Swiss-Prot record:
The keyword Secreted does not apply. NADP(+) binds at residues 16-40. Belongs to the short-chain dehydrogenases/reductases (SDR) family. Keywords: Oxidoreductase. GO terms for molecular function: oxidoreductase activity. InterPro entries: NAD(P)-bd_dom_sf, Sc_DH/Rdtase_CS, SDR_fam, YciK. PANTHER family: ALCOHOL DEHYDROGENASE (PTHR42901:SF1). Signal peptide: none annotated. This is Uncharacterized oxidoreductase YciK. It holds the Pfam family adh_short. It is an enzyme of class 1 (oxidoreductase). It comes from Escherichia coli (strain K12). The keyword Disulfide bond does not apply.
Length: 252
């Protein structure tokens, strides 16, 4: 996406990023901060979150807060408690990026481990729903709220061996569409399909792939910025490709 935002695009915006300790989430948090946002980091690895917060502080002079939440084990009550803690320190949320995700096993349906399947659904669907439900009151206090989910090409067209991950991303697309319809005038709700990107999750899915042939998280940030800023204000209920035209599968 060719998009050149103004440097103050996200001034006065408060944006929460899940999975903010690594990969795309880390890059998104740093990018949002660079463009003026107050960023809230969410993840399960405190040391990594501290490093990201320190990096943002060094670059922008603003110290982001971070919160620990393990999506694999969290309950609805945990999510509500987190939202209450956030509400003590912040009057609203202008954006939430659901970036955290679990890949699971890439193998035929006949070989899918039922517990791994449950884990993928817990992280990618159940916890994402519970966290969204808890954060909605804060998002609805914004006059320009943007809720962004992370999808995948296998969440639109199922492909062999992508079992639990594909099913979870179909569910993500559905959750986005339902929320967009419920909050048509009050909240933008969309999905981003990042496409093949140079991350640890990608390497585990395609261990033989040359990472140098992939876009970096920084390369795909224009779309992540656009969906959080005012330039996308009328877009809702849609799914966007960060790498339009890219063929799914291993990079050749």
């Amino acid at each position: 996406m060719h998009y050149q935002p103004k440097q103050d695009l996200l001034n006065d915006r408060i944006i929460l990023v899940t999975g903010a300790s690594d990969g795309i989430g880390r890059e998104a948090a740093m990018t949002y901060a660079r463009y003026g946002a107050t960023v809230i980091l969410l993840g399960r690895n405190e040391e990594k979150l501290r490093q990201v917060a320190s990096h943002i502080n060094e670059e922008t002079g603003r110290q982001p807060q971070w919160f620990i939440l393990d999506l694999l084990t969290c309950t609805s009550e945990n999510c509500q408690q987190l939202a209450q803690r956030i509400a003590v320190n912040y009057p609203r949320l202008d954006g939430v990026l659901h970036n955290a995700g679990l890949l699971g096993d890439v193998c035929p349906m006949s070989e899918q481990n039922p517990q791994v399947w449950q884990d993928v659904m817990q992280v990618n669907v159940n916890a994402t729903f519970m966290l969204t439900q808890a954060l909605l009151p804060l998002l609805l206090k914004s006059d320009a709220g943007s809720l962004v989910f992370t999808s995948s090409s296998v969440g639109r067209q199922g492909r062999a061996n992508w079992g639990a991950y594909a099913a979870s991303k179909f569910a993500t697309e559905g959750m986005m569409q339902v929320l967009a319809d419920e909050y048509q005038q009050r909240l933008r709700v969309n999905c981003i399909n990042p496409g093949g990107t140079r991350t640890a999750m990608r390497a585990s899915a395609f261990p033989t792939e040359d990472p140098q042939k992939l876009k970096t998280p920084a390369d795909i940030m224009p779309l992540y910025l656009w969906l959080m800023g005012d330039d996308s204000r009328r877009k809702t209920g849609m799914t966007f490709d960060a790498q339009p035209g890219r063929k799914p599968g291993i990079s050749q």
